[in-house]
């Protein structure tokens, strides 16, 4: 089956920027208990070496989700390139009922044709569950691989894949005029591009729901200010620069509002701006500090951190009024929550017995699962399909990005090569 290869506009425009040193995934905990799957190296039908390891990218994507455990290439019973070449009994003997095969061939004008098939090996002969073909320029080969991963993942799980998404984060370099950079990369750290450079700190990037803008905190004026930057043009608009603290921006899921934190009255409190009119209204008040807002899917409710009970804990409140409800109860303190896109759970920074880790709170049962075992974990951000979390952690004298599946089975590190990496934010679907 052939279909036109659709690319996201933001991806194309960001590719025009100069690439920096990549952030690459290093696996720190595998997924031996996840569903086994076969991903065969894609056959290269051209001269010399293949321009990209498409099969390797697909296998890595599926592994990163925590839901699949691709068979090591050294254990593959055969290396078919098409569904007709798959021998189902050879795979089922290894406990594998699904196999991804494919090939890459050169085409006109420096482009390539990438094709794949997802084969069900539970019957003999096997049946094709999904297939597709893409004609792309070389720089889009990884995107083609992520598309195959997304389609495979959705077919096998019923969950939309999130491998074509991106992450935004702040890098603090060790020297130079612009020590702080806001960057955007593919979810797996490839295709890293700068969005904004500054001699002063940059903090708290947040994606708009259509993926076209980033809100973040800058100190370039000498004090904190909230800005929104349009990614395709680079245009920056200041939206808040009140006395004292301006921070923690968060777009509502419907794109109509921006929540943020101000301390213009003394304590930190939540505010919401209507992005159409520019009108700002205060949501929380009192003597406590209220910060780190995260929206529920209804675009009317916020999860946030408050010390109203003495120590920081996660609460929720309706932006139109009402009594706040405490959500977190386990651990000495919990903060920095990010609500899942379906509103069924949140991830947060949970501190207990001196250890600071990322935990998942089921909002229906109140069950808490600690997902990480790294050091001084911060700023978790959930993938748009709710299967993965990216966060920052301390390593040595610096900070790096870490990836963990929301079931805790897969963990990986995205080590930076040129500075400390903080404040990750996962994009919506693009």
Swiss-Prot record:
Xref: InterPro entries: 6-blade_b-propeller_TolB-like, PD40, Tol-Pal_TolB, TolB_N
GO annotation, cellular component aspect: periplasmic space
Top-level taxon: Bacteria
Subcellular location: Periplasm
Gene3D superfamilies: TolB, C-terminal domain, TolB, N-terminal domain
An individual GO BP term: cell division
Signal peptide: 1-21
One Pfam short name: TolB_N
UniProt keyword annotations, A-Z: Cell cycle, Cell division, Periplasm, Signal
Subunit structure: The Tol-Pal system is composed of five core proteins: the inner membrane proteins TolA, TolQ and TolR, the periplasmic protein TolB and the outer membrane protein Pal. They form a network linking the inner and outer membranes and the peptidoglycan layer.
PANTHER family for the chain: PROTEIN TOLB (PTHR36842:SF1), PROTEIN TOLB HOMOLOG (PTHR36842)
Function noted in UniProt: Part of the Tol-Pal system, which plays a role in outer membrane invagination during cell division and is important for maintaining outer membrane integrity. TolB occupies a key intermediary position in the Tol-Pal system because it communicates directly with both membrane-embedded components, Pal in the outer membrane and TolA in the inner membrane.
Family: Belongs to the TolB family.
UniProt protein name: Tol-Pal system protein TolB
Biological source species: Sodalis glossinidius (strain morsitans)
Origin organism lineage: Bacteria, Pseudomonadati, Pseudomonadota, Gammaproteobacteria, Enterobacterales
